[in-house]
Each structure stands twice: as C-alpha cells, then as structure tokens.
C-alpha cells in the first residue's frame, strides 16, 4: 500500500523501470563501468542528503541495486520515495546507455 504524508496525488512518476514490491520501490541499473556507477551514486547521495531521504542500495562493479521505502513511516511507500525516484531518474538519464 502506498501512503502519502500529505495525502495529495503523486506529482512525480518514476521513469526508470521501478518495481513495487514489499512496500518498496526497487530497480537495478547498469553502467559502463565501476567509475560511472560510483559517479551516479555520488550524485544521488548529494540529492538524497538535500531531500533528507536516503536510498538503501548496493553496488557491484557496474550495477547499482536501489530500494526506496520510508523507514520513519513504518517502512512503507510515501511521496518521499516517489520524489526521490524521480530525482534518481533525472540523474540516471545522464548515464543511461543508448
């Protein structure tokens, strides 16, 4: 179940192939190499810090697995997760393979 802290409709729809499962938004992204994956993670980290909402993620060479959920809302999906997913989409567009 998705809950919105503000009870407003979602304004940001994720563009990456996000899967909703177990009250999380999940995706796995691939990059050219480790350096590109780490650069992406660094950009996301700065944006997440600004938003005060941080992903659960792991990196293995050129892959980044991301899980988004709101821990302080009982580990459920909220507007915060959808907003961060939208920012991750925006950042990923710079790195996406064509």
Where would I find each of the regions flagged by the language model?
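Short aromatic-glycine-(Arg/Gly/Cys) micro-motifs in beta-strand/loop hairpins
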Residues: 7, 11-24
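C-terminal structural segments of small proteins and small subunits
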Residues: 70-95
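Short, well-ordered beta-strand elements within core beta-sheets of diverse protein domains
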Residues: 24-32
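Short, conserved charged micro-motifs
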Residues: 34-39, 76-77
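A generic structural motif
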Residues: 62-69
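Short amphipathic alpha-helix segments
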Residues: 39-47
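A short N-terminal helical cap/helix-turn-helix that marks the beginning
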Residues: 50-60, 86-98
